[in-house]
Amino acid sequence: MAAKGGTVKPASGFSATEDAQTLRKAMKGLGTDEDAIISVLAPRNTSQRQEIRTAYKSTIGRDLMDDLKSELSGNFERVIVGMITPTVLYDVQELRRAMKGSGTDEGCLIEILASRTPEELRCINQTYQLQYGRSLEDVIRSDTSFMFQRVLVSLSAGGRDEGNFLDDALMRQDAQDLYEAGEKKWGTDEVKFLTVLCSRNRNHLLHVFDEYKRISQKDIEQGIKSETSGSFEDALLAIVKCMRNKSAYFAERLYKSMKGLGTDDNTLIRVMVSRAEIDMMDIRESFKRLYGKSLYSFIKGDTSGDYRKVLLILCGGDD
């Protein structure tokens, strides 16, 4: 199935200077014209939004991020600020938020580290160090423990094989190792799961999953669920899901953020902002297929006001 890509594309007939003037006008004097802010920023892609920030500073002599933060509030502010933050920096800030203060947002750590490409992860590491003067690995080590810590450290290194090569003998060995690591009567050899799932390329892993099913008569997901627990289990399952179908993984993240009472706004905002340009069309398709309703209708029913307006534009339409 061919990937459909993102909902946010570069706007044509784009003028950063004109957009900067429109934004200033929307925030000047009493009150704020939220609709004008949405109409400028939502249809632009990330690099165009960066050009607008530069134009705003050079033509108006003020910082766009500061102005938006002082004029807006709540979840709407968080979406807009996320949209004008460079992509890698946005991930870095989310990782930082997930480990700051008491408590850890394990779901956020898993989502970012399991879904980003090795190249993206290397950029995240460099930016984290520059931004906060500490390595991402250090912070993960001080904030997590045991096998969960080890899987995050392993993922964050961005060392996954990026090729497509399939070594048949190694593939069979990996499947056998995972089977034995889990089916051993005296407990689970978690390191084997970690080694295979964090370092092998996607093509290799998809074959490993098939071979594992052939020898164990169950899906790798079932094996992971019966042999591991807690955040370590969540991380391994996320890796498997991202390898099988990344857009379905994000569809599930969005569904879980909105189903039932209350909304997990952190997850909803992060996925909508970070995937709009990459694979939002594919996420929408997966969402409809998995849950029988459109992502658009879920967002519409779960949010309100300007927050809803901007998320629906990022969503890009109903299905």
Swiss-Prot record:
Subcellular locations according to the entry: Zymogen granule membrane
SUPFAM superfamilies named in the record: Annexin (SSF47874)
Keyword tRNA processing: no
Topology class, membrane: Peripheral membrane protein
Tissue expression summary: Expressed in pancreas (at protein level). Also detected in liver, spleen, intestine, stomach, kidney, and adrenal glands.
Residues recorded as bearing Phosphothreonine in the entry: T7
GO annotations of cellular component type: cytoplasm; nucleus; plasma membrane; vesicle membrane; zymogen granule membrane
Residues the record lists as Phosphoserine modifications: S12
GO molecular function annotation: calcium ion binding; calcium-dependent phospholipid binding; phosphatidylserine binding
Keyword Phosphoprotein: yes
PROSITE patterns to which the protein is assigned, alphabetical: ANNEXIN_1 (PS00223), ANNEXIN_2 (PS51897)
Modified residues (N-acetylalanine): A2
Extent of the Annexin repeats: 14-85, 86-157, 169-241, 245-316
InterPro entries, A to Z: Annexin, Annexin_repeat, Annexin_repeat_CS, Annexin_sf, ANX4
Family listed: Belongs to the annexin family.
Its job: Calcium/phospholipid-binding protein which promotes membrane fusion and is involved in exocytosis.
Full protein name: Annexin A4
Organism: Canis lupus familiaris (Dog)
